[in-house]
Structures are given as structure tokens and as C-alpha cells.
Regions:
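Conserved short histidine dyad/triad with adjacent acidic residue
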Residues: 17-34
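Histidine-centered metal-chelating micro-motifs
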Residues: 28-29, 65-66, 70-75
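Short, conserved beta-strand element in jelly-roll/cupin
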Residues: 33-49
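Double-stranded beta-helix
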Residues: 2-21, 75, 79-107
Length: 107
């Protein structure tokens, strides 16, 4: 089991400064994008990110990571237990092409 402090430390070792946010069960974010690259790590609960440009979605559970390059349109639906995520921003172009999910234990 990975705790929040370990996940924060792992991101900081990459030169990232994560912040934390939470949402209640079944909260919804409409489709949007950002002008910066974003790294997300789920630390509690779960969340599903829709990626309409590629016609798919990704589910994040505890320890899973999602990398979203700038301009990637995404929406989200929080799981039934709510969610807490760490989020860090990078200069646009830092992450390369296309979104990437990395499972817990693989990053």
C-alpha cells in the first residue's frame, strides 16, 4: 500500500510540486483543456477521465498516474467513494504527445 507522503515524495523527486484536491462521490467535470502539461496521481478513491479526442477513457485508482499534455481535452467523473488526487503542472510540451496512464507500481 502506498501512502500520500510517499506519492508526494516520488513526484518531488521528479522536480514536481504537487498540490492536492478532493471531490465527493459522482462529481462531474465537463470537457475542458489546459495550456500547461498536467500530472495527476490518485491518492484516495477513484476517478474516470474521458478523453474524447481519442474516443476512450481511463480509470485512476490509488497510486495510478495520468499525464495530460497541454491542449488535451478531458472530462471526469468521480467514483462512488469520492477522490483525492495530487496534481502538478509543467510547461507545455514537457510530456510529449498524447495522454498516458501509468499504473500504480509502474512509475
Amino acid at each position: 500500500v502506498t501512502d500520500d507522503a510517499d506519492l508526494v515524495a516520488r513526484l518531488r523527486r521528479e522536480g514536481l510540486e504537487p498540490s492536492s484536491w478532493s471531490n465527493g462521490p459522482h462529481d462531474v467535470y465537463g470537457a475542458h483543456d489546459h495550456g500547461y502539461d498536467k500530472v495527476l496521481v490518485c491518492v484516495q478513491g477513484s476517478i474516470r477521465f474521458g478523453l474524447p479526442a481519442i474516443g476512450s477513457s481511463v480509470e485512476l485508482a490509488v497510486g495510478d498516474r495520468l499525464e495530460l499534455p497541454a491542449g488535451t481535452t478531458h472530462d471526469a467523473v468521480v467514483g462512488s467513494a469520492g477522490v483525492t488526487c495530487l496534481e502538478a503542472h509543467l510547461v507545455a510540451g514537457s510530456l510529449g504527445d498524447g495522454p498516458r496512464r501509468i499504473a500504480s507500481g509502474e512509475w
